[in-house]
Amino acid sequence: DAPLIIDEIVMKIDSFKKIFEILNETQRDIITIGEKEIVEFGTLYSLSAVNSIAPHYRDITDPDHLFGFVFDCHLTLQMRDKLLLFKSNLATPKRIFLTRKSTKKRHYNESEVWGVLKEYGFEVVAPETYTFCEQMALFNNADYIVGGSGAAFTNLLFCHSGCKVICFRSIRNYSPIFSTIANIV
């Protein structure tokens, strides 16, 4: 069997590493390649990307940027089902308000929103403080999720079909990434 060649960052980020370990069902050998490393191969097999979504759009005014997305719903759901087999048994809240533990300030009135949501039984959650398997459980068990747009919303993939979500985002940067994920679940 040919080994799998991956970017070394996959093995340095716990959630990426866990996803890779789960999906590497054949237990192929792994060769990691550094960011600026140049490698020559005799024969190289390349896998097509399941999804191709360009990250980190900033101040997009041209709607044509939306045409660069490729999203295979069927394969994404297959991957979701495999990954959910490894979700944590952690007891998690049904109503979650997503925040960031880092000191990076959100660009909306987060404290005022929290003031309203706590009256409705929401709990503040910083997804980056959970393991990948715990994040799957957190989102899969939630009935309501509210928060500012960010990477944590990729976990919408693991929500159950009845989950209700409010995602605050800038009106200047429209991207259908999270709504596309939510619609396939």
Report each predicted region and the residues it spans.
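The feature primarily captures lumenal catalytic ectodomains
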Residues: 1-185
